[in-house]
Amino acid sequence: MALKDLPADAQPREKLLARGPATLADAELLAILLRTGIMGKGVLQMAQELLDPPGVDAATGQPTGGFGGIAGLLHASAADLERIKGLGPAKRAELVAVLELARRALAQQLRECAVFDTPDAVKHYLQLQLAAKGHEVFAVLFLDNQNRLLAMEELFRGTLTQTSVYPREVVLHALHHRAAAVVLAHNHPSGSVQPSRADEALTQTLKSTLALVDVRVLDHVIVAPGQALSMAEMGLL
């Protein structure tokens, strides 16, 4: 059913203004952002498609379907959104902007009160920071002696190897922040979080180098859309 065919008090925008945002379903809130549908597909249907469970095309191996709810959508990139029919460049840009604001708000809250004392806390924070990036990034969380966040820096971009990530630079940044410990992190835009041999070798190199200045490596987290892996939990540290 098109929005115009709904009773006035049931249309998402009017419902939000009259009753508050908490009364709206996720699809209704998205419909307000999207504003209009396309021929043969109403805006509510388009919004629901974004929230539908994801799938995989058996022939191509490419992702299909939606993003599995708001949490999954939070990590979607502009390129990911292209698979939803009817989402043109303008709608994709608006949606990505809103999602980025949401990620920044969540990350700020975590940063202001964060004590990274469990792998889950670290993974959650890093997913907000790295999962939606379309290129590979190597980042470091610099922590004090109580595992509180001092800073996060993206130090290198591109395919990560022992030759593209410079241990000296990581050490200099750790000393600059007076860090007692670090968490290493990088993303795999391809979607796999399994560590490669290069990931393991790089981790050991950085761990040995940072130990020379009494900085502990607590973990190396690999992030992909919708998932994250802790190398510490896997016993690879």
From Swiss-Prot:
Motif placement: JAMM motif: 186-199
Residues annotated to bind Zn(2+)? H186, H188, D199
Question: What GO molecular functions are on record for this protein?
Answer: metal ion binding; metallopeptidase activity
Q: Which domain of life is it from?
A: Bacteria
Cited InterPro entries: MPN (IPR037518), RadC_JAB (IPR025657), RuvA_2-like (IPR010994), UPF0758 (IPR001405), UPF0758_CS (IPR020891), UPF0758_N (IPR046778)
Per UniProt, the keywords (alphabetical) are: Hydrolase, Metal-binding, Metalloprotease, Protease, Zinc
Concerning Pfam families, the annotation shows: RadC, UPF0758_N
Q: Does the keyword Transcription regulation apply?
A: no
Gene Ontology BP term (one): proteolysis
Which parts of the sequence belong to the MPN domain?
A: 115-237
Q: Which NCBIfam families match?
A: PRK00024.1 (NF000642), radc (TIGR00608)
Q: Which family does it belong to?
A: Belongs to the UPF0758 family.
Protein name in UniProt: UPF0758 protein Veis_1654
In its UniProt entry, the species of origin is given as Verminephrobacter eiseniae (strain EF01-2)
Source species taxonomy: Bacteria, Pseudomonadati, Pseudomonadota, Betaproteobacteria, Burkholderiales
